[in-house]
Structure formats: C-alpha cells, structure tokens
Amino acid sequence: MLTYFPWFFVSVLLSFAACASAFVGTPVSIRASLKPSMVTMSASDSMGSLSRSDAIKTAAATAAAAGFVFSNSFPAMADGPYILPDLPYPYEALEPYIDAATMKFHHDKHHAAYVANANKAMAGKTAPSLLELQKDAIKAGTRNAGGGHYNHCLFWNTLCNHDSSGSPSPALAKAIDEAFGSMDEMKAQFATTAAGVFGSGWAWLGCTKDGKLAITGTPNQDNPLMDGAACTAMVPILGLDVWEHAYYLKYQNRRPEYITAFWNVVNWAVVSENYEMYASQGKGVPVVG
C-alpha cells in the first residue's frame, strides 16, 4: 500500500517548468494545494517504475528551481478523530541525510493521506487512540491507514538534526550489547533486515515480551504491535520507513545507502525514552495523532 505522489501536482510542476524561462529572475513560490484524499493507495511500491520515479525527481527539481518554499509543516485540519501532527523540526533539519523535498512530500502528502483514510475508516464509530487502534487493526482499511499513521508518527519523533543525534542511554546501550553484542552489530542486523524487506515496508528495533531487544521487518504499513502481523511480536522503539517514497528523490534505488545515512539522524534521547518508559515495561509507545 503506497500513498503515491500526486500526479496532478507532478503535471502542474512540469508545465510550470516549460514556462519558467520566461520568468528568469522573478521570485516564484508554489504552494501545494492538493487535499490528502487526492492521494491514492496501491498495494506495491515497485522500484522498477522508472517513469514514475523520473517524474518524482523532475517535479522536485522543478519545484526547487522555481523557488518552492519549504516552510515548516503544519497540522492538518482533521475531518475526524485523527490529525496530522507537526514535524518536530523544519523540513531541512535532516539534511544532507534526508532531503527537505522528501520530508515535505512524505509528511504533507503521504502521511496526510493515511490520516485522512484512518478518519474515513472510523467514520461513525467510536475511535480508539492511535496506539489502541494498532491492536485492533484487523480490517485492511483500518490496518493500512491506522498503521501508516502510527508508523509515521513514531518515525518522525525518532529523528532529529545530526548535531542532536546523541547516543543511547546507559540502559538502552546495555540492552543493545546484551541482545546483539555491540552497537555496530545491531546496526548491521538492522541494515540487513531493512534492505531485505521486499517491496515496501518497515524495519523495526523493539522490545519483545521477554524484555529483550530484537529486530524485525514488516510489509506495507504493518507494525509489530498488530495482531497477525508477519513479524516478531514486540513493542517498537525505532522504525525505518523503506517505502520507495521515503528515499527515492535523493537515493533513487540505493536503499542500502539510505539505510546507512539514517543512523546519522536518529534521536537517541527519544529512542532511549521509548525503551525505558514504555517498551521495557511492556507498554506501547504513545504518539500524538
């Protein structure tokens, strides 16, 4: 399931590029006006779709050349119980490891579509918290949209500017050493899992029921909190989005390079808190959304 890049937006940007030469030197900014509902869902995110990938790159380049304004994200006006929260940092905060264009499209379009679809799925029903929704996400629509919303909220919260990345807390560092032998070995196993996710999905570091750290991968927008997920059951404290839209603008088909870069922007203070306050006690990590 993928929230595909809005094709109408692509065509607008490409049309604008054709006219841009007539306005050289003129300050121009473009503000995306698509509603989240205009972003469609699909069951796969093929890396081999060159025409779509090229269009994504071309549109992003056009936006940058035209002076696209990458301002801070904003919370979406919710048409239901769930909202799109602000990013906890500017779009460009993760540069050069994750680019501003990717962050803007990923948050404002892809994540927003999951929020919109989660609200549609819960229309007329008593909506649980986003964390509780993960445990009850049985139906495909609820599972995909609710999982996509929770996964992205956790993802954004565990990232930060490289200068603020820090290190795991003593408690988390000890748990990592006990489970994997070393930090480097944990990263190596995580990278293998993330690179091995077929098509679209996530890689997770989390705490199992026996209190030990483990690594697992999930397809689509599943996560280890969900009943019936094809993965190791655990409370995730850190996740990496390996859907194509999370990295293609900058890394194209070089997923391993994206995975390596990811470690430069992990917010270890937040991940440590996720472990100590929640996962190590068997509690799911709550998120605002």
Describe every region a protein language model picked out.
Residues 14-19, 67-75:
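C-terminal segment of classical bacterial N-terminal signal peptides
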Residues 44-62:
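N-terminal secretory signal peptides and thylakoid transit peptides that target proteins
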Residues 253-289:
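N-terminal targeting pre-sequences for secretion and organelle import
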Residues 192-252, 258-266:
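An amphipathic alpha-helical core segment
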Residues 1-45:
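N-terminal chloroplast transit peptides
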Residues 53, 70-94:
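C-terminal segment of N-terminal export signals and the immediately downstream linker at the start
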Residues 86-110:
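Short His/Asp/Glu-rich catalytic/ion-coordination signatures at enzyme active sites or charged loops
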Residues 81, 109, 119-128, 132-216:
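All-alpha RGS (Regulator of G-protein Signaling) helical domain and cognate RGS-like helical scaffolds
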